[in-house]
């Protein structure tokens, strides 16, 4: 879902 995409991006940015 959209939240999963946000979490994935946040993890990649971290």
Curated annotation (Swiss-Prot):
Tissue specificity field: Expressed by the skin glands.
Keywords annotated in UniProt: Amidation, Amphibian defense peptide, Antibiotic, Antimicrobial, Fungicide, Secreted
Localization annotation: Secreted
Superkingdom to which the source organism belongs: Eukaryota
Gene Ontology terms describing biological process: defense response to bacterium; defense response to fungus; killing of cells of another organism
Glycine amide PTM positions: 14
Gene Ontology cellular component list: extracellular region
Role summary: Has antibacterial activity against the Gram-positive bacterium S.aureus, and the Gram-negative bacteria P.aeruginosa and E.coli. Has antifungal activity against C.albicans. No hemolytic activity has been detected.
Identification of the protein by name: Hylaseptin-P1
Organism name: Boana punctata (Polka-dot tree frog)
